[in-house]
Regions:
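Thiol/disulfide oxidoreductase modules built on the thioredoxin-like
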Residues: 127-132, 138-186
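Short loop/turn microsegments at loop-to-beta-strand junctions
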Residues: 52-53, 74-75, 154-156
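Conserved redox-active cysteine motifs that mediate thiol-disulfide chemistry
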Residues: 71, 79-96
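A short beta-strand-turn-helix
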Residues: 46, 55-75, 147
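Structural microenvironment flanking redox-active thiols in thiol-disulfide oxidoreductases
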Residues: 88-129, 140-146
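Hydrophobic beta-strand anchors of alpha/beta hydrolase catalytic cores
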Residues: 76-77, 110
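N-terminal targeting signals for export/organelle localization
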Residues: 1-51, 191
Length: 191
């Protein structure tokens, strides 16, 4: 029997780039078969310092990757979708400031994970944004749901250290936060 209960307590919600954003003092609780997961105000159900939930993703070229097989590498997951305007804004910066700088580093992996879209749409999306970093398919948003509430918005980056633990979580696109993400990746790869 599957039991899913979602509670939301908030002093308010606001619209931002077509996403509903819960205010900072919000609490969300999601229960799945006796497993209680608390979400932060951005919808994340994981926290910095925790082991990143494992998953298997199929890339647009057909390659299949399991996150746990990347242990020992710095991994950046970028949750995205073609219909997301903020994602489209952020992706060229990820391409230029992160991917092109580190794509030849054997200790770094970047995977864009496209939420619930078919292969042809994801390929067209990559072409229209000009990104060359690997994109994976997330049918049903099952990978996304390991990191955030399934019904929360995208434009999320998850930075995972070589030890498999989450080092940084971002939501939406903020220049200062993005600069910190780039700096953190650079620092982690110097070690």
């Amino acid at each position: 029997m599957n039991l899913i209960v979602l509670f939301k307590i908030s002093t308010g919600q606001r619209k931002q780039n077509n996403d509903t954003v819960l205010e900072k003092d919000s609490i969300e609780v999601k229960m799945e078969e006796n497993n209680v997961k608390k979400a932060d105000s951005t919808g994340y159900i994981v926290k910095v310092g925790e082991m990143a939930p494992d998953f298997t993703v199929t890339l647009t070229d057909g390659e299949t990757i399991t996150l746990s097989s990347l242990r020992g590498k710095v991994v950046m997951l970028q949750f995205t979708a073609s219909w997301c305007g903020v994602c489209r804004k952020e992706m060229p910066f990820i391409e230029k400031d992160i991917w092109l700088k580190h794509r030849n580093n054997p200790d770094f992996v970047l995977i864009g994970i496209d939420r619930d879209e078919p292969l042809d749409k994801v390929l067209a999306f990559a072409k229209s944004t000009g990104v060359t970093y690997p994109l994976g398919l997330d049918p049903g948003a099952d990978i996304f749901a390991k990191y955030a509430l399934r019904d929360s918005g995208i434009t999320r980056n998850v930075l995972i250290g070589a030890d498999g633990k989450i080092s940084m979580l971002t939501r939406l696109y903020n220049e200062k936060e993005f600069t910190l993400l780039v700096q953190k990746i650079d620092e982690m790869l110097k070690k």
